């Protein structure tokens, strides 16, 4: 019951108590005698008491709404508050999907509040869906795993890798942005609902800790409470085999909600289990991270993502070098490109400053209105999957002169025909919160792949341009080559996907590491076999 409804109910009770027939009959002539006027002071004092309680409740509610207003306003006024920070991005989605809804629907239907509700309902369809909140929560878990981040540190806004007793700062934000108990609860609950107690427990533990520290403080936007966090954490521990923790948390729950029969029954069940198996009280619960069936190279992949600049150097391998490249092309004679040979097997080259800031911005601007969830080939179909989180758009070279210039530059450097149907249109990709693409090949590995629909053979080469910089993460990791290339703004990576025999090069298995902090954009130009017969002649030797 809201403040206005409570006031109405209290006034109704007061009217009922003052409803003696004799008093009712005399109300119309109170003014006729001073003694009657004096008697009217008593009920007014009661009304004042009721109004005082109502105003105190309203003041508390308005103070809380003012707190929420200034909290959100400060984020919008601070120009140094980027959504490239995954914690800020998660809380933005949570605010729009959950917090604002709780704030708006907690208010009473007075005229000004009705206008607020109507305005909220008009924009509601444009707000993130619950699935977005789930996706953002899974992204935080992904970053937690790949970069070995400490949940307690994340809750404080700190990006730290914890290995044993060693703590490494991976990124130092200009402004710390901490998570609330409700934020941590939402992340933990997403894992909890998936039966993933490995991730659920540390997030729910942090939620419990934060809720304990602020117990009794009412926040309009919160969806969860200390009791919710204790309840979920207790069951998560029970499912993980730690009955003692489940029992202690359930007992704590009953301190705040002693009438909850379900939790009371759980306490009896846990006590019985411990009585029957005393060893469970001292046994340590070893939590194992959920296995990813399709990712057999997880440890190598994550190790490369954690190691910035893990490619070999010229000092260790003399055959790696840097040069100014013209590829004997008149187009590049007066403007050679800075070339860095990153690796030999597979052959991977990085071309520095391949595009200008203006060109990169133009390409991003052309693609942005057309971005859609990225898909991968699955048999003859193309489907969105959890192991590729990004949006992409395809741009024809006729869209803008910048794309024509780009094609000429790629052709001059590679010596390949990049015009359709011998190459695909430019694919522009923007990675989301914790955006990544787990280990994969660019070339088709199945005859039924949709790549063959172009009737121009397989993808012989990849030309990938970094259209932005990132503050942390996002490297391109070559799994079997055992090296990674960090994001270098405006640079381009080139590698061959196929041997000259037409067989796929297994060493080109690569991945886009999750973006830890930043807004990662890349552009891919995939060049096919057909049309390259005289530009890259075939060979029967497997090593070519």
From Swiss-Prot:
Which residues of this UniProt protein bind 2-oxoglutarate? Answer: 520
Q: Which InterPro entries match?
A: Oxoglu/Fe-dep_dioxygenase_dom (IPR005123), P4HA-like (IPR045054), Pro_4_hyd_alph (IPR006620), Pro_4_hyd_alph_FE2OG_OXY (IPR044862), Pro_4_hyd_alph_N (IPR013547), TPR-like_helical_dom_sf (IPR011990)
Main localization of the protein?
endoplasmic reticulum
Positions annotated as TPR repeat: 227-260
Subcellular localization, as worded in the UniProt entry = Endoplasmic reticulum lumen
Q: Which residues form the Fe2OG dioxygenase domain?
A: 422-529
User: What is the protein's known function?
Assistant: Catalyzes the post-translational formation of 4-hydroxyproline in -Xaa-Pro-Gly- sequences in collagens and other proteins.
Spell out the coiled coil positions from the record: 107-131
Q: Where is the signal peptide?
A: 1-19
Residues holding Fe cation: 440, 442, 510
Its required cofactor(s), as named, are: Fe(2+); L-ascorbate
Name of protein: Prolyl 4-hydroxylase subunit alpha-3
Residues with attached carbohydrate:
248, 482
Reaction(s) catalysed by this chain, per the record, are: L-prolyl-[collagen] + 2-oxoglutarate + O2 = trans-4-hydroxy-L-prolyl-[collagen] + succinate + CO2
What is one process in the GO biological process aspect for this record? collagen fibril organization
GO MF terms held by the record:
iron ion binding; L-ascorbic acid binding; procollagen-proline 4-dioxygenase activity
Keyword Transferase attached: no
């Amino acid at each position: 019951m809201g403040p206005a409804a409570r006031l109405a109910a209290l006034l109704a009770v007061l009217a009922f108590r003052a409803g003696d027939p004799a008093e009712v009959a005399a109300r119309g002539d109170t003014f006729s005698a001073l003694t009657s006027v004096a008697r009217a002071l008593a009920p007014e004092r009661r009304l004042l008491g009721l109004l005082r309680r109502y105003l105190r409740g309203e003041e508390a509610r308005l103070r809380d709404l003012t707190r929420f207003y200034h909290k959100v306003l400060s984020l919008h006024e601070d120009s140094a508050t980027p959504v490239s920070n995954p914690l800020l991005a998660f809380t933005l989605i949570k605010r729009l999907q959950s917090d604002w809804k709780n704030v708006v629907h907690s208010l009473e239907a007075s005229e000004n509040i009705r206008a607020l509700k109507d305005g909220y309902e008009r924009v509601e369809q444009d707000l993130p869906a619950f699935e977005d909140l789930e996706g953002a929560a899974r992204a935080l878990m992904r970053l937690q795993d790949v970069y070995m981040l400490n949940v307690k540190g994340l809750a404080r806004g700190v990006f730290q890798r914890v290995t044993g007793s060693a703590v490494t700062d991976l990124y130092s934000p200009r402004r710390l942005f901490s998570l609330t108990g409700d934020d941590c609860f939402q992340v933990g609950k997403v894992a909890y609902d998936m039966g993933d107690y490995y991730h659920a427990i540390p997030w729910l533990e942090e939620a419990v800790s934060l809720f304990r520290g602020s117990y009794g403080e009412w926040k309009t936007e919160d969806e969860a409470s200390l009791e919710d966090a204790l309840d979920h954490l207790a069951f998560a521990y029970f499912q993980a085999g730690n009955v003692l923790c489940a029992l202690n948390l359930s007992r704590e729950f009953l301190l705040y909600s002693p009438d909850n029969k379900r939790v009371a029954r759980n306490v009896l069940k846990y006590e019985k289990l411990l009585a029957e198996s005393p060893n469970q009280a001292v046994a340590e619960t070893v939590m194992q991270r959920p296995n990813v069936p399709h990712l057999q190279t997880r440890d190598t992949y994550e190790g490369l993502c954690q190691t910035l600049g893990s490619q070999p150097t010229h000092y260790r391998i003399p055959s790696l070098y840097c040069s100014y490249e013209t590829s004997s092309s008149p187009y590049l004679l007066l403007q050679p490109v800075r070339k860095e040979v990153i690796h030999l097997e597979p052959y991977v080259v990085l071309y520095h400053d391949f595009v200008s800031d203006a060109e990169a911005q133009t390409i991003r601007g052309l693609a942005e209105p057309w971005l859609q969830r990225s898909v991968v080939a699955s048999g003859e179909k193309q489907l969105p999957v959890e192991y590729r989180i990004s949006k992409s758009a395809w741009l024809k070279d006729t869209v803008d002169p910048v794309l024509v210039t780009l094609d000429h530059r790629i052709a001059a450097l590679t010596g390949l025909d990049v015009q359709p149907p011998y190459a695909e249109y430019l694919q522009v990709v923007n990675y989301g919160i914790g955006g990544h693409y787990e280990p994969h090949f660019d070339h088709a590995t199945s005859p039924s792949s949709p790549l063959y629909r172009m009737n121009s053979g397989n993808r012989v080469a990849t030309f990938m341009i970094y259209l932005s910089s990132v503050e942390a993460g996002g490297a391109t990791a070559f799994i079997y080559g055992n090296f990674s290339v960090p994001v270098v703004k405006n640079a381009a990576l080139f590698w061959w996907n196929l041997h000259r025999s037409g067989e796929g090069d297994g060493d080109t298995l690569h991945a886009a590491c999750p973006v830890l902090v930043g807004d990662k954009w890349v552009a891919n130009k995939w060049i096919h076999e057909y049309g390259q017969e005289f530009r890259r002649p075939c060979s029967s030797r497997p090593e070519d």
